[in-house]
């Protein structure tokens, strides 16, 4: 687990962009182990 990971199931990295933007203000992230990891 990491501080920039979201407990959100994903199937593709693009599914993480909007949640990452809402959570951290940047629409950058990737799908790792079916969870979103955001880049900040």
Swiss-Prot record:
Disulfide bonds join 2-5, 10-31, 16-36, 20-38. It comes from the Eukaryota. Transmembrane segments: none annotated. Expressed by the venom gland. It is found in: Secreted. The record marks 30 as: Basic residue of the functional dyad. SUPFAM superfamilies: Scorpion toxin-like. This is Potassium channel toxin alpha-KTx 12.3. Pfam families: Toxin_2 (PF00451). Keywords: Calcium-activated potassium channel impairing toxin, Disulfide bond, Ion channel impairing toxin, Neurotoxin, Potassium channel impairing toxin, Secreted, Toxin. One of its GO terms (cellular component) is extracellular region. The record marks 39 as: Aromatic residue of the functional dyad. Has the structural arrangement of an alpha-helix connected to antiparallel beta-sheets by disulfide bonds (CS-alpha/beta). Belongs to the short scorpion toxin superfamily. Potassium channel inhibitor family. Alpha-KTx 12 subfamily. Inhibits high conductance calcium-activated potassium channels (KCNMA). Inhibits Shaker B potassium channels. One of its GO terms (molecular function) is ion channel inhibitor activity. It comes from Tityus costatus. Its main location: secreted.
């Amino acid at each position: 687990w990491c501080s920039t990971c979201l407990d959100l199931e994903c199937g593709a990295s693009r599914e993480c962009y909007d949640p990452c933007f809402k959570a951290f203000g940047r629409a950058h992230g990737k799908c790792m182990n079916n969870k979103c990891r955001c880049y900040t």
